[in-house]
């Protein structure tokens, strides 16, 4: 072992050299300490859904809310097509007395067929009524633009999401004007979901138009005469503009809902529009719209804060007529602003904070938990408590399930890609189990269940759950299957099950248009790893089409497509790829999900390639390996007085000595192999809830040092250099060397420009990092992890001092 590696491991204060004897659990981490109290708006609900108000408008709102809530139940419980058909029939006038509102009681959790029939009975409809309408609805499978088996592009497949006729909306049938703001929003959300699962430019444009119609329907019911409210769109409100709580006190219940719907429709339209437009200036315009919508959401929150203050003061708040739908809507929107902005780099966060946006992720998550009355640290509920939760009207808010979905998504999906603090998989499972009890046939919550099993390394159970969920998806929503197929593909690649992986990737290439570039590449590498010689010509042909499948979102290329395109160029130039499946897994963090036995198999395969490449290393380069590395910091600056100076002074000699005949990108593969070996060894060393493996930690450090040594010779795959820095900093965090880890993260942030002048490909490379955005997100989360670790250490030290 190299002396520098031994020094890395030997540094420490206790008998484990700073490392814990046992690794922490990935299922549950301590909850965060919040900087401010969390409001509990669910206690403000003072509305009886069965009382008949005097206003016809409010009567209509009550009926629309109850119907849309029930349609949402149908949608979640696998009756997606039927819910869409009922919604498409349009608003039922309350004056016709057609709807039996009491018939909706207790329908959650019933069998799917009974739920549908009882809903139809309550609405005065028959199954034939909605079947007739379903014939006029768009079929999702018809717009999936399936490719032929050899990967040829169909006529509707374009390399960009936006069609070539951008701006000509006459090709898309204009959405009919909607009269009900909730029907309009519901229809727009369904159309937006269809746009996302198909990625069809026409469907995306229809979704944008649908949200515009929903906003118009809500705008007609807004109280625009209130001073400050009508000026939300003014440019002057962009920086510091807000709507005070007093503006909402003068509104009736319908007008408050109109404000909420208007803001939500604006937000969702802007986000969907970003996918559609390729113009960066259009993205800037949508950011302004998001700011305008936020002023409304912030005003509603201020209003509810003032009502909560009245409640704490013992005042009667019945006259405010706050219902669970308004509570769940304000909670969801304001929390998402906090959570999403918090993931952005510090410089962007500070800019957004300057113009009034919040960015407290932990507080946003806690606000969502309060909406559902969830407590991550609470003991399991008693049967009586559970029954009370199911019966509570506060859980009937039309956005209630979305408030539950956000923490589940961040716990079991986002945390797999971006390291997060305070991950609690038990908490996510508790929320998801509750919703599965309400919606046992829901493909959405079954997906979350499967994903939870997947991230906890229970691959067989995860695949079984994914298969079960796919069986419940209706033909009209066939493209949702692709989400499950992709997860099964990742599991198959993790297990080196090349047959299944090849089958799944071909299905995605044939049926899905999410990313033709990515799916072509996956089809190629799974076929390549399967090793069937008769398919080699098809593989070569399809690899030549990878780059042409790239698309743009908000005027920018997607990082994973850039990665696939660069790898395809390498393959076409050299005729081979090194460990392409493991290389691709880095993009989706599947190493974090691998069980110990699979990690062991991966290490054996990667180590075999490492040994093979070591045999190809020129002898003169092996002689150079005796030169000592920098004793501590392995950054390029640390080399400036040693190794790099010898490179610059003997550049021609170094190029000659390092050359491997017939292997132009040898050092790209050499560093990649050692990097992958280090990553797998890292995960073995710090496998959750297992004993710390010192030997694997030493192997990881040794592998990373090898990457640092040969990084100046990398020509294309410079991402290995940056990720190596990241994983070395992660080891230091485990060891308690927080200052060193922080310095390494800040060093990486200093390299986050796209040109990377002089770093690290100093000899002949381009110096670009195709996975830069991933590095930035990981480093940002790593800095937050260091802050949390310091706070925990400070709290522990304080408790020790107080006990003395």
Listing of model-derived features with the role each one plays in the protein:
Residues 60-63, 77-82, 104-141, 145-434, ...:
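Short coil/linker segments at helix-helix boundaries
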Residues 54-57, 88-95, 171, 353-358, ...:
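Solenoid-like repeat scaffolds
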Residues 61-66, 400-402, 439-446, 477-485, ...:
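Generic helix N-cap/helix-start motif at coil->alpha-helix transitions
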Residues 2, 8-96, 100-105, 178, ...:
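N-terminal alpha-helical scaffolding segments that mark the starts
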């Amino acid at each position: 072992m190299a002396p520098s590696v031994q020094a890395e491991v030997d540094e420490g204060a206790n008998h484990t050299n700073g490392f814990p004897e046992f690794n922490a659990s990935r299922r549950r981490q301590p909850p965060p300490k919040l900087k401010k109290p969390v409001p509990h708006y669910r206690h403000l609900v003072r509305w009886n859904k069965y009382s008949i108000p005097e206003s016809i408008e409010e009567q209509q709102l009550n009926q629309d809310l109850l119907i849309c809530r029930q349609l949402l139940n149908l949608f979640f419980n696998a009756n997606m097509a039927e819910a869409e058909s009922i919604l498409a029939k349009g608003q039922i006038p309350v004056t016709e007395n057609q709807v039996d509102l009491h018939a909706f009681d207790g329908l959650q959790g019933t069998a799917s067929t009974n739920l549908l029939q009882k809903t139809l009975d309550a609405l005065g409809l028959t199954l034939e009524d909605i079947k007739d309408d379903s014939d006029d609805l768009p079929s999702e499978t018809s717009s999936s633009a399936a490719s032929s088996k050899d990967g040829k592009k169909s006529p509707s497949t374009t390399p960009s999401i936006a069609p070539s006729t951008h701006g000509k909306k006459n090709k898309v049938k204009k959405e009919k004007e909607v009269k009900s703001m909730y029907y309009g929003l519901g229809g727009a959300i369904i159309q937006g979901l269809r746009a996302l699962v198909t990625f069809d430019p026409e469907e995306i444009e229809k979704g944008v138009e649908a949200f515009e119609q929903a906003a118009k329907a809500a705008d007609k019911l807004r109280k625009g005469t209130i001073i400050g409210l009508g000026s939300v769109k003014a440019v002057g409100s962009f920086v510091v503009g807000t709507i005070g709580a007093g503006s909402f006190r003068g509104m009736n219940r319908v007008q408050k809902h109109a404000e909420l719907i208007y803001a939500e429709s604006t937000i969702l339209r802007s986000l969907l529009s970003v996918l559609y437009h390729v113009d960066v200036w259009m993205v800037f315009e949508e950011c302004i719209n998001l700011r305008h919508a936020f002023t409304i959401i912030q005003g509603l929150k201020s209003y509810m804060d003032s009502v909560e203050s009245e409640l704490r003061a013992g005042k009667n708040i019945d006259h405010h007529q706050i219902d669970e739908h308004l509570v769940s809507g304000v909670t969801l929107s304001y929390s998402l602003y906090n959570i999403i902005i918090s993931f952005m780099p510090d410089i962007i966060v500070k800019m957004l904070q300057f113009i009034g946006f919040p960015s407290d992720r932990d507080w946003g998550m806690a606000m969502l938990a309060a909406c559902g009355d969830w407590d991550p640290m609470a003991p399991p509920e008693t049967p009586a408590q559970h029954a009370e939760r199911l019966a509570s009207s506060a859980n009937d808010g039309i956005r209630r399930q979305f408030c539950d979905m956000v923490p589940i998504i961040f716990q079991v999906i986002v945390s797999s890609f971006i390291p997060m603090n305070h991950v609690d998989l038990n908490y996510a499972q508790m929320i998801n189990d509750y919703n599965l009890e309400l919606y046992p046939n829901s493909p959405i919550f079954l997906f979350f269940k499967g994903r939870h099993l997947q991230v906890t390394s229970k691959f067989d159970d995860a695949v079984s759950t994914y298969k079960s969920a796919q069986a419940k998806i209706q033909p009209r929503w066939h493209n949702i299957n692709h989400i499950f197929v992709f997860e099964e593909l990742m599991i198959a690649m993790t297990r080196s099950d090349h047959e299944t992986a090849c089958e799944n990737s071909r299905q995605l290439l044939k049926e899905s248009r999410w990313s033709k570039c990515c799916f072509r590449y996956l089809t190629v590498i799974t076929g390549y790893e399967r090793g069937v010689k008769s398919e080699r010509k098809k593989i070569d042909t399809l690899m030549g089409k990878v780059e042409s499948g790239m698309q743009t979102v908000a005027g920018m290329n997607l990082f994973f497509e850039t990665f696939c395109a660069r790898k395809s160029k390498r393959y076409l130039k050299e005729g081979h790829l090194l460990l392409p499946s493991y290389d691709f897994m880095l993009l989706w963090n599947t190493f974090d999900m691998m069980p110990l036995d699979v990690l062991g198999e991966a290490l054996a395969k990667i180590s075999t390639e490492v040994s093979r490449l070591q045999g190809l290393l020129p002898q003169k380069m092996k002689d150079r390996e005796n030169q000592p590395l920098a004793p501590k910091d392995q950054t390029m600056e640390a080399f400036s007085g040693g190794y790099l100076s010898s490179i610059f002074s003997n550049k021609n000699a170094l190029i000659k000595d390092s050359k491997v005949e017939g292997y132009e990108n040898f050092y790209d593969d050499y560093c990649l192999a050692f990097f992958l070996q280090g990553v797998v060894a890292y995960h073995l060393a710090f496998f959750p809830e297992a004993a710390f493996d010192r030997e694997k930690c030493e192997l990881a450090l040794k592998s990373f040092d090898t990457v640092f040594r040969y990084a100046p010779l990398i020509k294309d795959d410079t991402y290995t250099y940056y990720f190596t820095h990241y994983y070395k900093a992660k080891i230091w965090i485990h060891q308690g060397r927080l200052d060193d880890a922080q310095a390494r993260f800040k060093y990486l942030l200093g390299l986050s420009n796209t040109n990377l002048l002089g770093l690290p490909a100093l000899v002949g490379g381009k110096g670009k990092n195709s996975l830069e955005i991933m590095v930035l997100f990981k480093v940002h989360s790593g800095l937050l992890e260091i802050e949390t670790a310091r706070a925990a250490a400070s709290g522990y030290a304080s408790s020790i001092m107080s006990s003395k």
